[in-house]
Every structure is written in structure tokens, then in C-alpha cells.
Amino acid sequence: ICIIPWIFLAIGILTKGPVAFIIIFTTLFSFLLTHKNWKKLLVKINLSKGLLITFLISSPWYFIQLIQNGNVFWDNFFGYHNLKRYTSVVNNHAESWWFYLFILILASLPFSIFLIHGIVDTFKELINKSEIRSESSNSIYIFSLCWLISVLLFFSFSATKLPSYWIPAI
């Protein structure tokens, strides 16, 4: 098992909380849907060992915080900084649903046209050619597209929108 991705997931969970977990597993799920041999790929990922590694690295800090601060930590970190920011507008940071599409174009300047071209090409190949679903040479493009769309969709549904929320897509 390659433990490096699981270590980075744990670091993401330590720095950003459950959002890191949600983004990774939304990406992973959508990526698996694009592959004919998704079961074989799932075995290679070794989900149970990976999740155990992630849990062992990230959980001690959360447990210590809960023991030291109790409900204050729970309400502040999970309640306010995760749930409330996602479900309601905080600090007047309301934007329309397409806000991150604009950020996508703006953040990728001056290469926006290449990004859009790559997205469109990958979508076309994914839809039109069934053989792409088993080719490993295209996997990085498909995974990147799944990652980009997962971040874009997740944060587009968020009530509070900040340009910095887009950073995980980069």
C-alpha cells in the first residue's frame, strides 16, 4: 500500500476538517465511476488500510481538543467553521452558484483557454470513447477532471463563498 496519499489526507483533515475527507471521497467515487475495472482499482487503493492510516494520524488531535475544550471545540470547529459556513452565509460572503466558475477562469489566467480546452477534451473522450475508461494513460486527466468538478460542485453548493475556498482545486 502506498501510504503517502493517506498521510496527505490526514494532514488535510487536520488543517481543514471534514471538508478534506468529503472532497477526496467525492473525487475518488466519481473517478471509480469512470473506470470499467473499478473493483480492481478499489483493491489497489486499499481503502480499509488507508482509512486506518488516516484515522491514526488525524484523530489524536481531535480527541485532545474534545477532551480539553469539549463542546466549545465541537460547536466552534464543526458547528461554526464547517457546518454553518456551508449551510448559511457568514460575514456577508454570499455569491451566486456560478461564482467558482468565474474564479476558475480568473485563477488560471493567462492559461484559461488551455484549461477549458483540456476540460472539454477530457469530457469528450470520456463520453465518446468507451476504451478510455480502461486506459491508464488517460487516468491522470480523468482524475484531474473528477477532482476539479468535485471541488467546484461542493463549494458551489456552499452558502458562504470565498475565493480561497477554490484552492483545493488547484
Regions found by a protein language model. Name each.
Residues 7-8, 15, 20-166:
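Transmembrane-lumen/periplasm boundary regions of multi-pass, lipid-linked membrane glycan transferases
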Residues 4:
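Substrate-binding/catalytic cleft of secreted carbohydrate-active enzymes
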Residues 1:
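Membrane-interface transmembrane helices that cradle and orient dolichyl/undecaprenyl
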